[in-house]
Amino acid sequence: MLMHNPPHPGEIIKELCLEPLGISITEAAAALGVSRKTLSAILNGHAGISPEMAIRLDSPLPLTPRQRAG
């Protein structure tokens, strides 16, 4: 069955990766080496994911002990 309005990839990253680990957009942006504004636009569905950003997102984020503990 086809989805009529599939979610933006950034929304999926936000909901399935950042939120469950308690990682803020600011923390994730710093770990990825991008501005908070850039990452926020992607996660909120206002910007696409460039090939360079896809490579950055493919790398594991360095987590603090608090984040690893959940």
UniProtKB/Swiss-Prot annotation:
Signal sequence coordinates: none
Domain HTH cro/C1-type, residue spans: 13-68
Gene3D superfamilies linked to this entry: lambda repressor-like DNA-binding domains
GO molecular-function terms, A-Z: DNA binding
Alphabetical UniProt keywords: DNA-binding, Transcription, Transcription regulation
Family (UniProt): Belongs to the VapA/VapI family.
Protein name, as recorded: Uncharacterized HTH-type transcriptional regulator Synpcc7942_2319
UniProt organism field: Synechococcus elongatus (strain ATCC 33912 / PCC 7942 / FACHB-805)
